[in-house]
UniProtKB/Swiss-Prot annotation:
The keyword Nucleotide-binding does not apply. NDH-1 is composed of at least 14 different subunits, Nqo1 to Nqo14. The complex has a L-shaped structure, with the hydrophobic arm (subunits Nqo7, Nqo8, Nqo10 to Nqo14) embedded in the inner membrane and the hydrophilic peripheral arm (subunits Nqo1 to Nqo6, Nqo9) protruding into the bacterial cytoplasm. The hydrophilic domain contains all the redox centers. NADH-quinone oxidoreductase forms a supercomplex with ubiquinol-cytochrome c reductase complex (complex III or cytochrome b-c1 complex) and cytochrome c oxidase (complex IV), which stabilizes the NADH-quinone oxidoreductase complex. It is an enzyme of class 7 (translocase). Pfam families: Oxidored_q2. Belongs to the complex I subunit 4L family. InterPro entries: NADH_UbQ_OxRdtase_chain4L/K, NUOK/Mnh_C1-like. This is NADH-quinone oxidoreductase subunit K. It comes from Paracoccus denitrificans (strain Pd 1222). Its main location: membrane. Its EC number is 7.1.1.-. GO terms for biological process: ATP synthesis coupled electron transport.
Length: 101
């Protein structure tokens, strides 16, 4: 049977993969956003695993809120990237740093 440890290991692997994605590919903003979403998914897996292990629904409810906020964050981030690409013609991180007030 799959226990709590297995879910925590999967969550840790996903979280480390997200961190690795951010550190390896600092040039592409879309990959950075996807890595952040992967890290949030890993945290949600841990919330659900602990919630199931303890028999409490609070972790699962909190996971739904985190998923909602993550979806809104991804939609707003991609909308900003589309506008930035239309204005600048690129979405490189170096070009994002030159934006001023």
């Amino acid at each position: 049977m799959i226990g709590l440890t297995h879910y925590l290991v999967v969550g840790a692997i996903l979280f480390v993969t997200g961190i690795f994605g951010i550190f390896v590919n600092r040039k592409n903003v879309i990959v950075i956003l996807m890595s952040i979403e992967l890290m949030l998914l890993a945290v949600n897996i841990n919330f659900v695993a602990f919630s199931t292990h303890l028999g409490d629904l609070a972790g699962q409810v909190f996971t739904m809120f985190v998923l909602t906020v993550a979806a809104a964050e991804a939609a707003i981030g991609l909308a900003i990237l589309v506008v930035f690409f239309r204005n600048r013609g690129t979405i490189a991180v170096e070009d994002v740093n030159v934006m001023k007030g």
